[in-house]
């Protein structure tokens, strides 16, 4: 085992603070509408220019092990806030740096770190209650657009396109962000349920222009197993042919003579039919087939429930207004399932989302929920260069997370004002002893810091602006973009309550841990052996000529 280096008390905390300051100074310059750019070197290609706090934080790795530990802990604050609320990473970093700096001064002056932590926790709990109390539900698309605009560093086009996407697919709908091919952002809406499986044979195509199979008012057969024997299918095919309607088959696979017979029937015009593979794998495939069955009012033909293909009737088939199948995707539009059954299925998936601990499972469940509840919107980000594309895409994703957070927990006035108003409620808060009171005042001082930083980045005087905002009430604040004071909500400067709350809680949590740190252990740096010397010159060879 490699030898370890151990640092104690003040020495450890000072090294840790140095690392925190390096990271925080690099990140906090991006805060606010007048935030500055940070240029990140890439191992190949052009450097990346960004105003996204979490992108900057992720790039920072320090050579000193102890300083790096401090930087990594604050990086954790930023990424934790980003995971929970999708935004607020820079605010969280600014808060953590302030709490730690003031906290370590108090520890150096002889205060008890545990009492300081208790005081900070008490203040944060009271401030979070106040943030909840002042939050206003975010329902109209105008407010959603404003939240998106603020989060995307004052880019109105991003705010508008996110609001439009939410209008189209609903609050539960899936909104994905992709690289576009033009200069402008584009919004594509996929109506109905779409899954990533295409036709099993190109002979099913009936629309040569779009190279797709389009079936109006079809029956939909949903089968869990492979279909290779045509005899299994005959009863269903005869029933569908008599009804004179098209048929879509969704199964694990359709192969051999079964596929050949379907293709021949389709080409001769005896029966309009198309077959696709079932989406997903394993248990997720079963669940998705059940979703399709609920959406179309059909039944999954499965041995688990004692149903076989030979015994299936038209009553077991689902129906829809239209099914569109391309090489890669299948879209079911306007399924005939009852709204009660669909709502029941949606409620069941929501419960699974609440109970799951896996981020991957949660993402997949949310996709299934959206396909049942609303639809899918795709935002295609347009830009002139690849560097701009990456930066813009990161901002769109941030803004999307922020608007989701706003819909979830409501909105508060932005620009650091919510924390100033919450701070006013902490004036009468008292701890159990003097050291806890100092902890409370550390948290209060930190809550001023985001506003100070926004103002400093805009090139104004932080103390003057802070006093004027503190004298005001309600939504009164400072618009750093224009240099004016006024009602922040009326000016469209809003923050999701969830973002402000998460930033404060995560910053206080990690900063309190660092204040109560008494020892740090890291591997001793290895001394690199010098490179061996090269071979000497081979003098005297000239005489051999």
Swiss-Prot record:
Subcellular location(s) per record: Cytoplasm
GO cellular component: a single term: cytoplasm
Xref: PANTHER family: 60 KDA HEAT SHOCK PROTEIN, MITOCHONDRIAL
This protein's UniProt keywords: ATP-binding, Chaperone, Cytoplasm, Isomerase, Nucleotide-binding
GO BP terms, alphabetized: protein refolding
Name of the protein in its database record: Chaperonin GroEL 1
UniProt function note: Together with its co-chaperonin GroES, plays an essential role in assisting protein folding. The GroEL-GroES system forms a nano-cage that allows encapsulation of the non-native substrate proteins and provides a physical environment optimized to promote and accelerate protein folding.
Presence of keyword Kinase: no
Annotated positions binding ATP: 30-33, 51, 87-91, 415, 479-481, 495
Family: Belongs to the chaperonin (HSP60) family.
Main location: cytoplasm
A molecular function GO annotation: ATP binding
EC number(s) from the headed UniProt entry: 5.6.1.7
Subunit structure as annotated in this protein's UniProt entry: Forms a cylinder of 14 subunits composed of two heptameric rings stacked back-to-back. Interacts with the co-chaperonin GroES.
Chemical reaction(s) catalysed: ATP + H2O + a folded polypeptide = ADP + phosphate + an unfolded polypeptide
InterPro entries: Chaperonin_Cpn60_CS, Cpn60/GroEL, Cpn60/GroEL/TCP-1, GroEL-like_apical_dom_sf, GROEL-like_equatorial_sf, TCP-1-like_intermed_sf
Coiled coil: none
Chaperone as UniProt keyword: yes
Source organism of the structure: Methylococcus capsulatus (strain ATCC 33009 / NCIMB 11132 / Bath)
């Amino acid at each position: 085992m490699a030898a370890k280096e151990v640092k104690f008390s003040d020495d450890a905390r000072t090294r840790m603070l140095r690392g925190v300051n390096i990271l925080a100074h690099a990140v906090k310059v991006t805060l606010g509408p007048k935030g500055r750019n940070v240029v990140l070197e890439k191992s190949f290609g052009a450097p990346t220019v960004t105003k996204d706090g979490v992108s900057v934080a992720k790039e920072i790795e320090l050579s000193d092990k102890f300083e790096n530990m401090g930087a990594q802990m604050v990086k954790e604050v930023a990424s934790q806030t980003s995971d929970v609320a999708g935004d607020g990473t820079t605010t969280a970093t600014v808060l953590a740096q302030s709490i730690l700096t003031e906290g370590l001064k108090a520890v150096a002056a002889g205060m008890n770190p545990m009492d300081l932590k208790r005081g900070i926790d008490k203040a944060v709990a009271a401030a979070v209650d106040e943030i909840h109390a002042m939050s206003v539900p975010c329902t109209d698309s105008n407010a959603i657009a404003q939240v998106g605009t603020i989060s995307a560093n004052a880019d109105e086009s991003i705010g508008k396109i996110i609001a439009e996407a939410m209008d189209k697919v609903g609050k539960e709908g899936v909104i994905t962000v992709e690289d576009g091919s033009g200069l402008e952002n584009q919004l594509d809406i996929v109506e109905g349920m779409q899954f990533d499986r295409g036709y099993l044979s190109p002979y099913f195509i009936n629309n040569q222009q779009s190279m797709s199979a389009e079936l109006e008012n079809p029956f939909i057969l949903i089968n869990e197993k492979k279909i290779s024997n045509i005899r299994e299918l005959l009863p269903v095919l005869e029933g569908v042919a008599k009804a004179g309607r098209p048929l879509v088959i969704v199964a694990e696979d359709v192969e051999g003579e079964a596929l050949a017979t379907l293709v021949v029937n389709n080409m001769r015009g005896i029966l309009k039919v198309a077959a696709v593979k079932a989406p997903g794998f394993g248990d997720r495939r079963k669940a998705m087939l059940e979703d399709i069955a609920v959406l179309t009012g059909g039944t999954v033909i499965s041995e688990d429930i004692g149903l076989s293909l030979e015994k299936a009737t038209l009553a077991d088939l689902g129906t829809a207004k239209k099914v569109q199948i391309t090489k890669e995707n299948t879209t079911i539009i306007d399924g005939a399932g009852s709204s009660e059954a669909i709502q029941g299925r949606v409620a069941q998936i929501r419960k699974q989302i609440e109970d799951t601990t896996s981020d991957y499972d949660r993402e997949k469940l949310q996709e299934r929920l959206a396909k049942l509840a609303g639809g899918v919107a795709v935002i295609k980000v347009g830009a002139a260069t690849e560097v701009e594309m990456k930066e813009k895409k990161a901002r769109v994703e941030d803004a999307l997370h922020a608007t989701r957070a706003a819909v979830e927990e409501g909105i508060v006035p932005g620009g650091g004002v919510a924390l100033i108003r919450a701070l006013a409620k902490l004036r009468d808060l008292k701890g159990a002893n003097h050291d806890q009171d100092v902890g409370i005042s550390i948290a209060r001082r930190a809550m001023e810091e985001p506003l100070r930083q926004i103002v400093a980045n805009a090139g104004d005087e932080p103390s003057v602006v802070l006093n004027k905002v503190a004298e005001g009430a309600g939504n009164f604040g400072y618009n750093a973009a224009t240099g004016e004071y006024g009602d922040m909500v009326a000016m469209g400067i809003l923050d999701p309550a969830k973002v402000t709350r998460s930033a404060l809680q995560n910053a206080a949590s990690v900063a309190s841990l660092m204040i109560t740190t008494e020892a740090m252990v890291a591997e001793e740096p290895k001394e690199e052996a010098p490179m061996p010397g090269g071979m000497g010159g081979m003098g005297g060879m000239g005489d051999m000529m």
